[in-house]
Amino acid sequence: MPLVACDDSLLTVIDLQPRFWAERLDAEDKRRAEEAARRAAWLAAAAHALGVPAVITEEDPEINGPTDEAVLAPLRASAPVFTKTVFGLADCPEIMAAVRSTRRRTALLAGFETDVCVTHSAVGLGEAGYRVVIVEDAVYSPFGAHLPGIVRLRDLGFELMHCKNVYYDWIRTLPAARAFQEHNPELAHPPGFSL
């Protein structure tokens, strides 16, 4: 499998809505969910800085609230936000039209929940012919469902990558990495890992 090319990548941020973790989770699940959300926000900002388009979904925002502001901030001007009432984004024609309009063939998935909406979206995108990459440190499911979701995704044949792996696949060279960090100092120290 080749490296993930920046100019062929599309970031899909799936249901990264704080109400999924702010009120319903115990302390450990909440900590892990917040960590995944911070990494997804960093990835969204890095994607924006590198010209990688994004599509954002929200599940039932009247109940679950809007997408995390840290994710929306860098993407607000360029990424469409879609409400969905199905678990897999590929089952929504308007979302798939936005995905297709990017003309990118590699879909990177971040968001919630690993075992349901992320998995259903991965399967649908895969069936539509996309190379699907799960950014495993930027997805999460509570109540012990995260690891089984990751295992299922792996067993289904989807690629699993860390935010750091994605960054270096996108950047490719030391001069490009130095230039990125110089032009984006706020992204030079990502949450929970080093560049």
Give each language-model segment a name.
Residues 58-59:
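Glycine-rich N-terminal segment of FAD-binding domains in flavoprotein oxidoreductases
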Residues 2-10, 50, 62-195:
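Active-site-adjacent betaalpha module
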Residues 9-17:
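N-terminal nucleotide-binding beta1-loop-alpha1 segment
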Residues 17-23:
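Short acidic, Gly/Ser-rich segments with clustered Asp/Glu that frequently serve as metal-coordination loops
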Residues 7-9, 24-55:
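A short alpha/beta connector and helix-capping loop motif
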